[in-house]
Amino acid sequence: MKVLILSCNTGGGHNAAASALKESLNFYHHEAEVLDLMSLGRKHTSALVGGAYVKLVSVFPAGFGALYQLGELVRKFPWKSPVYYANARLGNALADYIDQNHFNAVVTTHLYPAETLTWMKQKGRLTIPCVAVATDYACIPFWEETNCDYYVVPHKDLIPEFASCGIPEEKLLPLGIPVRPAFARPASKEDVRRHLDLPENAPLFLVMSGSMGFGKVHLLTHELVSRLENGEQAVIICGNNKKRMRSLRLQFHKNPNVHI
């Protein structure tokens, strides 16, 4: 079987899930390809969409929150959202790509390609099965206006929420968020700490901020470090946010109990 896995360059979680799916499909001797949907648009579409999203979330999170709330409002209207029509513009290009490469199924780990696939189904340009994988622990706005064959959700407790938004319950599969098979391999705490040059027995606080290093990580780090005692360690993960990483390393480079 040959599977096309669609993602979008808006943060790392969607791409990580797509890569995990590809790795698992390859393990079972299926052919799989990961494609950024926006790469089918104009030359700089992917960079513009991804860059705008990352900037908004990391630099102006209040603006992102406002847009999210607007999405919650728009989803109540009986017609399709502007998000749907924006992604529908890539429908013909995606349909041609699928036909030219003879895929047997298509999976998306992002809402945007699900919107595109929905348009394609409506226009009769999609004849292979399509599956959407939700990578958020909530039914975010606009999933309800998509029409995929199945929806993989992170947990069975989310089925009522997705169903209440209009997605047929028989299409909801509570299989979880895809992760790489490597995470299933057991590893001892002692070996991992030695590998990361961390004290083997000291209490450790781990602070994660997503692939983009967003949020008030610097404030949390300062507050946490001020409360460390008796050799407690703090590990701060900044994702791809190199600016934040450099800033925190500069501030805490003299503290042996803080690892950025």
Please tell me what each predicted stretch does.
Residues 189-190, 199-260:
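Donor-nucleotide binding loops and adjacent catalytic segments primarily
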